[in-house]
């Protein structure tokens, strides 16, 4: 019943509403208002998602800076060890400039104060201390007997702090100072042995050297390296080893070996070749008319061979090689330095021919000395006035015309040769075989 009542109560309002509508059909049925749409709630803006804060990148830990490796300290460059001075340098250091210049001069004994041609007297002994010459040249006028000559050469050397050269001009035959006075060796001029070959040339060189040493000489102005290529030549002729350039070259080289075996220094002469001339340089100017190229192919062959065999000195002839220089060869830088030293490679001592010869009559001793040394000469043979020659060289050094280095070069060559001289003499006195 209860359920029925509830149902009736619910239907009554519906009935009433239906009746009212049927009784007033014309009445405007008021518009049933559209039910107001429940306004949609304003959309709540979706909040932008709060961006996750970008995490600050965890900074890479700053690496500790790798310490720069401590550089190894740059070692100071090891200085090149200062070379020990050579024996000749030690000798040179003890010499004043003037004493060095005297080493570049060869005297005749008569040039000394109170000069005596046969024995050293007291005045000469004192003068040797004031003028310590590089050497002495003895000629036939200094030779009277074997005992006298031995004493003379011994006493000339005895007063010298640096042993002097004791030189002779001993070729055999035409130029035979010892053989024509006190010696026992009688050789003919070398040309006569040319067809007996190199062994004979070597033997003759050794024989000459041994006789020279017997009388106190330590250097010879031989062998002759000129070639007798001009039949009209009057000054060389039979003194030459040959009239053929190649043969002369072989014989001269063998002779150099012979001189050394006998214990004596030797000298090639007369550079650049006196065998194709006609005049005699003892009396005046002598001209060589060959070109330099012709000299290389001819006259220079024996000089080249002798140098390669170890010759100690080369003598510059009083010759004018007009294709190269209008002055005598000893004043020619082109001949002495460029040709002889640089082209032929000669490292020994360059010596002049005797400065008293007629070919140099128009030059003073001072001029000759300075011009020759500037050209490359080391040793002045027998100037007429040795004191004037040394004075001129000293003045040229003080004025800067000659450098002290240039003088030093020559003196070192001379001292080196003297040390070699001692070695040769020792070897000859005590042959290994």
Predicted segments, located by residue:
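C-terminal motif of bacterial Sec signal peptides marking the signal peptidase cleavage site
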Residues: 17-21
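Preference for extracellular/luminal or secreted protein segments
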Residues: 22-35, 39-43, 48, 80, ...
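Enzymes and membrane/adaptor proteins characterized by extended Gly/Ser/Thr/Asp/Glu-rich
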Residues: 110-114, 125-248, 270, 275-289, ...
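Short beta-strand/loop segments at the ligand-binding rim of alpha/beta enzyme cores
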Residues: 98, 165, 263-266, 345-355
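Bacterial N-terminal signal peptides that target proteins for export
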Residues: 1-8
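Alpha-helical scaffolding segments of alpha/beta enzyme cores, especially the outer helices
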Residues: 90, 151-158, 207-210, 246-258, ...
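Phosphate/pyrophosphate-binding betaalpha-module
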Residues: 251-268, 294, 298-311
């Amino acid at each position: 019943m209860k359920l029925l009542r509830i149902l009736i109560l619910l239907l009554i309002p519906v009935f009433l509403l239906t009746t009212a509508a049927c009784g007033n059909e014309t009445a405007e049925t008021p518009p049933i208002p559209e039910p107001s749409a429940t306004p949609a709630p304003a959309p709540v803006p979706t909040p932008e998602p709060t961006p996750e804060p970008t995490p600050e990148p965890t900074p890479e830990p700053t690496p500790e800076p790798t310490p720069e490796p401590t550089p190894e300290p740059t070692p100071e460059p090891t200085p090149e060890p200062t070379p020990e001075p050579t024996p000749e340098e030690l000798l040179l250091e003890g010499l004043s400039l003037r004493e060095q210049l005297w080493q570049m001069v060869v005297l005749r004994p008569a040039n000394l104060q109170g000069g005596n041609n046969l024995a050293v007297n007291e005045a000469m002994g004192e003068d040797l201390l004031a003028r310590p010459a590089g050497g002495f040249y003895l000629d036939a006028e200094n030779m009277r007997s074997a005992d006298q000559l031995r004493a003379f050469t011994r006493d000339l050397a005895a007063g010298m702090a640096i042993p002097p050269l004791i030189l002779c001009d001993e070729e055999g035959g035409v130029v035979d100072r010892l053989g024509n006075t006190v010696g026992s060796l009688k050789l003919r001029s070398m040309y006569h042995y040319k067809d007996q070959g190199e062994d004979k040339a070597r033997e003759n060189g050794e024989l000459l050297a041994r006789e020279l040493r017997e009388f106190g000489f330590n250097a010879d102005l031989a062998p002759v390296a000129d070639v007798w290529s001009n039949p009209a030549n009057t000054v060389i002729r039979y003194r030459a080893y040959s009239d053929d350039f190649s043969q002369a070259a072989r014989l001269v080289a063998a002779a150099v070996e012979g001189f050394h075996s006998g214990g004596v220094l030797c000298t090639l002469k007369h550079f650049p070749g006196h065998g194709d001339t006609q005049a005699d340089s003892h009396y005046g100017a002598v001209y060589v008319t060959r070109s330099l190229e012709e000299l290389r192919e001819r006259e220079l062959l024996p000089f080249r061979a002798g140098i390669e065999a170890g010759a100690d000195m080369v003598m510059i002839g009083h010759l004018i090689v007009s294709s190269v220089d209008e002055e005598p060869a000893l004043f020619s830088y082109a001949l002495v330095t460029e040709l002889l030293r640089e082209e032929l490679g000669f490292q020994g001592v360059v010596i002049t021919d005797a400065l008293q010869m007629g070919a140099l009559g128009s030059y003073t001793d001072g001029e000759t000395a300075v011009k020759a040394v500037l050209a490359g000469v080391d040793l002045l043979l027998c100037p007429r006035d040795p004191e004037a020659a040394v004075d001129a060289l000293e003045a040229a050094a003080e004025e800067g015309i000659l450098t002290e280095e240039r003088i030093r070069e020559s003196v070192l060559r001379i001292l080196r040769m003297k040390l070699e001289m001692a070695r040769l003499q020792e070897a000859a006195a005590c042959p290994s075989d």
